[in-house]
Structure formats: structure tokens, C-alpha cells
């Protein structure tokens, strides 16, 4: 019996590991344009702020597609669905690597965004399902760790590959790694029937839960603020702080490394007081943005700010996702799809706001505007915390 139990634990952890790798590759490709923005803009003879709208387009496809695509695929067996999503993901990256103009690149990114829409709608509930019985919360933390490693390894490595070869090679390598993950998924994942996915009828039911709706609005607000600044952090560091490209790469690495600390803090502290944890994480996201320009030329201070910012955004993202799952246990996939959609509305809006700020005010102001949006989100958190204190 002990051997059987050990085998179960081993395979369950390996399956969680596959999902963590999947999160790594999806998050790497979503945000790697941030690390390659200047190179992509230069190759197409465009401005960084204009190319940055590619981030907005990607995010808005995800935000608009998450719920309807999840509902359309609600009855499909989950392993088969995941393999299809990875096939689409890989083919789209081949097109990205071959893109002969910006519009072809944009179209290829839309294919990736469609895969992303469904992947993040179903993954949180699936990783909890395949996890060992007493490791459900830790499994969600490992999923977030995969996302954090995308920032630690994916973005810096993507930037290094882009600098040594070119940005097209970065997308090609991502497609290659995704192929290996797809093979692991095919080999290790069990048959996963759709379960508690919810239906279209679940949507109005969820929308009648005011705290859940409040959390979705909070996600849009705080993520909009975050991505107003983060979408253009690479050109800010190079042009405003005037640090070298190597320092810029190292700062992206530090941001991702901080995400591991954020995942750890979530696992240790969230259950003790979820409301205070979310508020503290938001403060860590907001303050570095507001102070970014103030300390723009102090290298060690910028490193510290980026580290704290990375801790904040990672722990905040996991905490908000966990809160959504807690508030909607009867329709986890629908709730996750709306969460993913809300998150990507924030990404798209933030990248758009950042582009507008750069064109109207200047690159140096992105931190002030992003931080101000974060402060509005903090006030909203305070309001819903008081309003729904017993929920």
C-alpha cells in the first residue's frame, strides 16, 4: 500500500510539474515582447510605443475570447483540449519566427492569444485536480512558480537570444520548448473529463455575487496600472535611466526572481489573512511605480524597487485567483475564464494607457500614471472589504 501511495504522489507531482512548465512557456511568450520591444520596433522601422500596442491587441483577444471559447470547449475532455491548444501555440510561433512584416507578427500573436484564452481558463482547476490530495494550495503555488520562472529565465533568456541572434529566433526557441512540453503532457496526463466547468447559465449566477464582481473590477484596475508601467519598462530603463542593455536584462531577471519569493509568501501567509495579504501585495506593486522616475539614476534603488514590485505582482495575482476560486467553487472554469478575461483587459488597457502617456506626456511619466491607477484600485479594495466584510 505504501508503494502504491508513493507512486501516486510521484505521478501527481510530475503532472503538477507539467502544468508548471506549461505556465512557464505561456507566460514567457505573453510577456517576451516587453523584453524585445526595441528590437522588434527597430526591425520594422517603427516606434516602441506603436509596437507596444501588440501587447494590447494580444491582451484584448484573450479578454474577449476567454469566456466564449471556454464555453464552446466546456464539454471537451481536458487532455485532448490541452494538446490541441499546444499544437495551435506551436504553429503560431513558427509564423512569428517567419513574420515578414509587423502585421504578420500581429496575426501570429492572435493565434497564440486564442490558445492562451482557453489555457488559463481551465488550468487552475486542472492543476488542483491532478495534485496530491493534501497539496492542493501548494499546487496552485507551483503553477504560479512556473509563471514566475518565465520572468526569471524566460524573459532574460528571450532577450539574450534576441540580442545574440535576433528576436525571431526567440519565438522559434519558444515554439521548440513548447513541443517538448506537449510531449510530456501527452505522456503524463491522465484522461481528464470536463468537471464543474459551468455553462452559459453560470455567468448570470456568478454576476449576482457582488464580492466576486468586485474582485474582477479590482483585477482590471490594478493590472491596468501595473502594465501602464511594466509594458514599457525596457525602454524606460534604457532611455530614461540610461542603463546598459546588460543591466536591463539583469533587472528583468531580478523582477522574475522576486516572483519566486512572491509565490513562497503566498503559500505561507495567504491563508492566515487573505484580505491583508492582498492589500500588502498591492502596496508593493504601487509604490515602486510611483518612485520609479524619482530614483531613475540610482541603480541599486531601481533594483530594489523592481524586486519588491516583482514580489507584489506575483503574490497579488495568485491571491486574487485563489479568491475567485473560493468564491465560485460551483463553476470554476467559468469563474477562471472571467478572471483571465479581466486580467487581460487590464494588460491591454495598461499597455494602451502607457502608449498614450508616452505620446502625450513622455516616457518618464509612465510610473506616475501606473501608480495613480494602482492607488485607485487600492481605494476600491478598501471599499469592497468594508462593504462585504462577512463574505
UniProtKB/Swiss-Prot annotation:
PROSITE patterns: MFS. One of its GO terms (cellular component) is plasma membrane. It comes from the Bacteria. It is found in: Cell inner membrane. It is a multi-pass membrane protein. The chain crosses the membrane at residues 16-36, 51-71, 82-102, 103-123, 138-158, 170-190, 210-230, 247-267, 277-297, 300-320, 338-358, 361-381. GO terms for molecular function: carbohydrate transmembrane transporter activity. CDD domains: MFS_NepI_like. Pfam families: MFS_1. Involved in the efflux of sugars. The physiological role may be the reduction of the intracellular concentration of toxic sugars or sugar metabolites. This is Probable sugar efflux transporter.
